[in-house]
From Swiss-Prot:
Top EC group: lyase
Domain of life: Bacteria
Protein name stated in the entry: 3-dehydroquinate dehydratase
Gene3D superfamilies: Aldolase class I
Catalysed reactions listed for this entry: 3-dehydroquinate = 3-dehydroshikimate + H2O
Protein encoded by which gene: aroD
Ligand binding (3-dehydroquinate): E47, F48, R49, R83, R213, S232, Q236
Gene Ontology molecular functions: 3-dehydroquinate dehydratase activity
EC number assigned by the record: 4.2.1.10
Pathway of action: Metabolic intermediate biosynthesis; chorismate biosynthesis; chorismate from D-erythrose 4-phosphate and phosphoenolpyruvate: step 3/7
GO biological process: 3,4-dihydroxybenzoate biosynthetic process; amino acid biosynthetic process; aromatic amino acid family biosynthetic process; chorismate biosynthetic process
Species, as recorded: Neisseria meningitidis serogroup A / serotype 4A (strain DSM 15465 / Z2491)
Assembly notes: Homodimer.
Length: 254
């Protein structure tokens, strides 16, 4: 039975699927403009994709920009994500820098949720999860497959592995090569929901997988990602259109 997670009065893992909007900006000026553009959009969680920053190699600058996001949206749950190149992100970096950055963000207590890549070394991942939770920050463990959709059993196994590492939220994103692959992801989501004790987040990327971003409440995915001003992953739907569609699916349509 999945337990829910409450972050700034937002309940993750129960009720309607929550909408996260990624913040994608290269510098302070663009970040300020994007924050102004998204502030009135109908989203539940803001995800700061710090790997898109030109200054992503400076921990101090990343902290400064994260503070800007926190100050601009004080009442929204803040998910900090630094996606590395190997998992589809914009910034290639060493494990040492990656975990040093995560530790700095955790110690700052600026984010409410922190994204940690599952396959970054089990010991380091477990330490980061424990450190986050010690500082009152939820740990979201994640994995991304940008070239394929693993079999259902493997998807479920990876989500279970995240939970075993102590994750508060378990997330996987896969790339479909066919409509059947989308069904595989949805079936895995349903199975994982039955087994998981923590909220799960799943998506099939690209245009083919877009339906998975709308079906979370039915199959068990707790968060869906919708674009504000710029997509951070293939197949993201605009936040306003995503909210309208989710409302329609929940309430029924004439």
């Amino acid at each position: 039975m999945c337990s829910c997670l409450v972050v700034k009065n937002t309940v993750i893992g129960s009720g309607r699927t929550k909408i996260a909007v990624p913040l994608v900006a290269r510098d302070a000026a663009v970040l300020s403009a994007v924050l102004d553009q998204i502030k009135n959009l109908p989203f539940d969680i803001v995800e700061f994709r710090a790997d898109f920053l030109e200054c992503a190699g400076s921990i101090g600058e990343v902290l400064r920009h994260t503070q800007t996001v926190r100050d601009a949206l004080p009442d929204k749950p803040l998910l900090f994500t630094f996606r590395r190149h190997g998992e589809g992100g914009s910034f290639p970096c060493s494990d040492d820098y990656y975990f040093e950055l995560l530790d700095a963000l955790i110690e700052s207590r600026l984010p409410d949720i922190i994204d940690i890549e599952l396959f970054s070394g089990e010991t380091a991942v477990r330490c980061a999860v424990a450190n986050a939770q010690k500082n009152g920050i939820a740990a979201l463990l994640c994995n991304h497959e940008f070239h394929r959709t693993p079999p259902q059993e493997e998807i479920v196994c990876r989500l279970k592995q995240m939970e075993d590492c102590g994750a508060d939220i378990c997330k996987i994103a896969v790339m479909p090569q066919s409509a059947e692959d989308v069904l595989t992801l949805l079936s895995a989501t349903l199975k994982a929901k039955e087994l998981a004790a923590k909220p799960i987040v799943t998506m099939s990327m690209g245009q083919t997988g877009a339906v998975s971003r709308l079906a979370g409440q039915v199959f068990g995915s707790s968060i869906t990602f919708g674009s504000g001003t710029q997509n951070s992953a293939p197949g993201q739907i605009g936040v306003s259109a995503l909210r309208a569609t989710l409302d329609c699916l929940e309430n029924g349509a004439d």
